């Protein structure tokens, strides 16, 4: 029973993501979500008290997916640049494989408590990486947020531009971007 409940909640979250990409966050209604998820409208209320609760849990899901993406194939025994490259590529490929997430990036910022969720995450992979690399004397003494904007955020920006401007980024160009964004945060 627990698995079925999790699957249905995931079905509702996937419908939320698709509907946001197609119609926008401000156009979401529980009725539209139910239709998109192929469930009865009342079924959604078995899982979520109201739209705000659904969207807040959805925000947690989106952020958790992003954190899991950073962790994928991460090996802290590798040199710092290799660790960085892995996180950068993880973000890039995650966004290539999840086009609705890419379409919804700006809208996620409008989700209830999304900014608070992002701020309150401590000891995530990126933070730990930054602290260890700073301790080793490799990274600039800037906050994790600033380091992220100068480095991993380039994967997000390029993925977004590649989708909407429709240009192809060859592997050697991506490698060059990874190397240059790494240099941007070095001491």
Swiss-Prot record:
GO molecular function: DNA-binding transcription factor activity; transcription cis-regulatory region binding
Annotated HTH tetR-type domain residues: 6-66
Recorded coiled-coil stretches: none
Domain of life: Bacteria
Keywords: DNA-binding, Repeat, Transcription, Transcription regulation
GO biological process, one term: regulation of DNA-templated transcription
InterPro entries in UniProt: DNA-bd_HTH_TetR-type_CS (IPR023772), Homeodomain-like_sf (IPR009057), HTH-type_Tx_Regulator (IPR050624), HTH_TetR (IPR001647), TetR-like_HI_0893_C (IPR054422)
Family matches, as PROSITE patterns: HTH_TETR_1, HTH_TETR_2
Pfam family, one: TetR_HI_0893_C
Residues of the DNA-binding region: 29-48
Descriptive protein name: Uncharacterized HTH-type transcriptional regulator HI_0893
Organism (species): Haemophilus influenzae (strain ATCC 51907 / DSM 11121 / KW20 / Rd)
Lineage: Bacteria, Pseudomonadati, Pseudomonadota, Gammaproteobacteria, Pasteurellales
């Amino acid at each position: 029973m627990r698995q079925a409940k999790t699957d249905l909640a995931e079905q509702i979250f996937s419908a939320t993501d698709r509907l946001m990409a197609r119609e926008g966050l401000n156009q979401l209604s529980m009725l539209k979500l139910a239709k998109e998820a192929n469930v009865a409208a009342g079924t959604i209320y078995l899982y979520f008290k109201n739209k705000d609760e659904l969207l807040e849990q959805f925000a947690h899901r989106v952020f958790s997916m992003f954190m899991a993406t950073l962790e994928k194939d991460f090996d802290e025994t590798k040199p710092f640049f290799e660790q960085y490259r892995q996180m950068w590529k993880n973000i890039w490929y995650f966004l290539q494989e999840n086009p609705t997430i890419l379409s919804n990036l700006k809208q996620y910022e409008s989700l209830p408590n999304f900014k608070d969720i992002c701020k309150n995450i401590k000891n995530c992979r990126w933070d730990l990486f930054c602290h260890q690399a700073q301790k080793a004397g490799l990274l600039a003494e800037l906050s994790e947020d600033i380091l992220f904007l100068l480095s991993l955020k380039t994967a997000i920006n390029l993925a977004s531009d590649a989708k909407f401007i429709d240009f192809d980024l060859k592997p050697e160009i991506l490698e060059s971007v990874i190397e240059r964004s790494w240099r941007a945060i070095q001491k």
